[in-house]
Amino acid sequence: MKQLYGVIGNPIGHSLSPVMHNDAFEHLNMDAHYHAFLVKEEVLGEAVRGLKALGISGFNVTTPHKVAIMDYLDEIDPLAKQIGAVNTVVHKDGKLIGYNTDGIGFVKALQSISSEPLQEKRILLLGAGGASRAIYFSLADVGVKEIDVANRTVDKAKELITACTATVHSVALSLEEATEEQENYDIIIQTTTIGMHPRVEHTPLQISSLKKGTIVSDIIYNPFETKILCEAKEQGAMIQNGIDMFVYQGALAFEMWTGRTPNIERMKQLVIRKLGG
């Protein structure tokens, strides 16, 4: 019997997840299908109950449901509970279990380009929203000890830092302070929507002086190279856009659902092609 998977969100027509997962199913000769479901906020509960009743094997959760979905699940993974958001649901033994693969997907993407362990790195996070929180908690979860957070509203950065129970040395900074301190970091991670199409001329941080070997990562992938990545490249930094994070979080969900490991590079190249790269 064909296994059913999917993604719920609103809007959902732009999602690249169906293309990525269905190609992986085909490549691995699996009898499964992944479908995008448009689910409005006011019917989220009914939709989740319906998916469970239909016997869906698992599904992803995207905007605007990542927080609200938690009220409709039977169990929530401890890391997802700490992050306060779920993006992956596994249907197992009659229960819907929520996980967050966004943060750990980002960590795996970062590990794929870093020649040294992340635990030894001093990291700067730009932004203190949902994506930043997932990344901060996941970096802490793998043992990173120094993570500073810079945000337009410093109090929001402080809130993120104090919410984490792991032993991490962190300082909350203004964006101006982060600009002055940028050469003290091994890795800079941009987690806001600043610089996303169509406002591509914007950047949260003017890159002017980086130490040698710095990695600058931006979770945005439209455009492929945001202003902050262009400036970092000019400074000689290794850069990474948001495609890797998207692919790795999807691959982690795929493994949780199926127990099979998809071809990461195949997934990545497919997404790049679909984005017109």
UniProtKB/Swiss-Prot annotation:
The keyword Magnesium does not apply. Pathway: Metabolic intermediate biosynthesis; chorismate biosynthesis; chorismate from D-erythrose 4-phosphate and phosphoenolpyruvate: step 4/7. It catalyses: shikimate + NADP(+) = 3-dehydroshikimate + NADPH + H(+). Pfam families: SDH_C, Shikimate_DH, Shikimate_dh_N. GO terms for biological process: amino acid biosynthetic process; aromatic amino acid family biosynthetic process; chorismate biosynthetic process; shikimate metabolic process. It is an enzyme of class 1 (oxidoreductase). GO terms for molecular function: NADP binding; shikimate 3-dehydrogenase (NADP+) activity. One of its GO terms (cellular component) is cytosol. NADP(+) binds at G127, A128, G129, G130, A131, N151, R152, T153, V154, D155, K156, I219, G242. Disulfide bonds: none annotated. SUPFAM superfamilies: Aminoacid dehydrogenase-like, N-terminal domain, NAD(P)-binding Rossmann-fold domains. The active site is at K66 (proton acceptor). InterPro entries: Aminoacid_DH-like_N_sf, NAD(P)-bd_dom_sf, SDH_C, Shikimate_DH, Shikimate_DH-bd_N, Shikimate_DH_fam, Shikm_DH/Glu-tRNA_Rdtase. Keywords: Amino-acid biosynthesis, Aromatic amino acid biosynthesis, NADP, Oxidoreductase. Shikimate binds at S15, L16, S17, T62, N87, D102, Y221. Its EC number is 1.1.1.25. Belongs to the shikimate dehydrogenase family. Homodimer. Involved in the biosynthesis of the chorismate, which leads to the biosynthesis of aromatic amino acids. Catalyzes the reversible NADPH linked reduction of 3-dehydroshikimate (DHSA) to yield shikimate (SA). This is Shikimate dehydrogenase (NADP(+)). It comes from Bacillus cereus (strain AH187).
